[in-house]
Amino acid sequence: MKELNFLNIIKSTLDNSSFIGDDCAYLDDLDIFVTQDTLIEDIHFSLYTTTPYLLGRKSVSVNLSDLAASLSVPKYITVSLSMPKLTKDSFVSELYRGINDVCRENDIQVIGGDITGAENVAISICAIGKKQSKFLTSRSYAKKGDVILVTGEFGSSAAGLHALTQYLYADEYLLQKH
């Protein structure tokens, strides 16, 4: 996918694109941060290599990472779930159990979302956080020499998925990151 190319097209098309390009947007008038990530079956995860529970945990956690990078405290999420019509009730129950556990651990409330049909499972989380510092951080403020902090290793989830789907040996830690 040509993400940067698409972002440039979007920026040039929208009347106001000042928030486009960062993982997290700070809305000054509301004093909140907003982020959204989508996980799609067979691209970001495989149902052959993960459980619905772990998928639920991961779907929330990737958003919490974006909020943490912006120095904000997560407060609310919405969950949009797309899935095939033959999806079992137990899948939804376990997925939301994983979502709920991460929310409970971080004092986050699920405030809504959407459910729709699709060929494959896709889960999209919108997370809202409150500013916890007088400082704002974002890519647009970054400059040469800045210190960058991350909440995990870059590419470990993709590497774990690749190892699992290609039947390659990988350390258990890497497999769990998927």
Locate each region found by the language model.
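Helix-biased detector of long, well-ordered alpha-helical tracts
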Residues: 1-178
